[in-house]
């Protein structure tokens, strides 16, 4: 029989069929009862699987690509081996029961954000903090920092820093900017140094976080600018030498500085090139306002992380590691109890005048600070046979003072308490001074192993800032004023770092009576 023309025959004729056929008389459809092998791709649109049971894909060539949505799957999906790639899912995914996931690496590496909503109480164990979210000892940064020092200078220069000007230069307080301008001329050696009147105590086991804000002069040849937690012997600071940026550790222990140039920083180099050495993609410009930070894990051999806070993020630029390092056989610097310092210096002749702006600083003990039980308690007082006779003209007379030894000017000493006892009934007034200078009397070492001297008979007050003033009642009662945390650090003994002059903690008294005698005592805590 001749093969018919398909366009002329309807329905088609089937030839050479060796399998059983079935005709659906109602529809006219013919079904072949056999397994059909399909060569090529079959595109399947949306498939709704509404029945319970298993979907068997065995025997097919993998991978199986499904385009479109698969909805209405109930039951188990088992026996999947290999990788499953799931494109982003929009909407909610409801999961009932346990989800067990096994993979081959530990710990898991997760990129991006994970948002989890817990409908019931659950135990969440988080460990292994790293980077800027943790402090220097690996603890998650939480909201319990203890502020040891801060300076804002909103309305006045509060005298928290000493200045040392060499050659042509000056320091100008700018009230409407709450900042200071450090200005130098062009001659070699012109410099302005600014350092706090006291160092800030490091407590072992606590991360010490320092933040300094500034704006350096545009870098130029022979102009060096520095900011950080340091003094002439030890410390951690950021430096621009006119050509390069550096992170520096100054060591009084080794007598050298470890200077790491920007292109060798082991964190984010802030070069703007992106990639592994600059994951933030940010470029550092020291001539713009910046927030420099350092967190110190001292213990003599700990790590120091330094960097900048930019757009609200702590960016670690470099980490100095000291434990278990080749060649390290002693502490990396003498102490971490150090002052805040700013410097601008001409290392040789400079083409034009320069200005660095000092803005704000803070020193924080992360994880709190326990003053009680720390250091050595000491005291000084008048002996019973030698009270102090007050003047009859109601003028204030110094009765007792303490100060740092000239050899221990970086010691941390906190006055904790004082007591005053009049010997007769009268009206007595007293004043407590910090940052005082007196004349006369004799300074006595508190002990051979103490950093403090006391004076039981100063003659006159030369200068000082009144920190407290009040009255003693007229019934021979004692008065005491224990200094409590966190206010205790406001009374820390200070010194002028560039002249080596120790400032005094001083008590003066006055009375309306005549020939009035008093006793006085002071207690303090020597932290370092």
Segments from the language model and where they lie:
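C-terminal interaction-tip segments
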Residues: 221-242, 313-316, 500-502, 508-528
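Localized edge beta-strand/strand-to-loop motifs within extracellular or lumenal beta-rich domains
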Residues: 287-303
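Extended, low-complexity segments enriched in Ser/Thr/Gly and acidic residues that occur primarily
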Residues: 1-164, 370-426, 469
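Beta-sandwich interaction modules
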Residues: 278-286, 290, 475-502
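Noncatalytic modules at the cell exterior or secretory-pathway interfaces
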Residues: 334-344, 416-418, 494-513
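Low-complexity, Ser/Thr/Pro/Gly-rich disordered linker/stalk regions
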Residues: 121-250, 255-268, 322-394, 398-407, ...
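Short, aromatic/His-centered strand-loop micro-motif at the edge of beta-sheets
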Residues: 255-291
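Extended, solvent-exposed segments with strong compositional bias
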Residues: 451-491
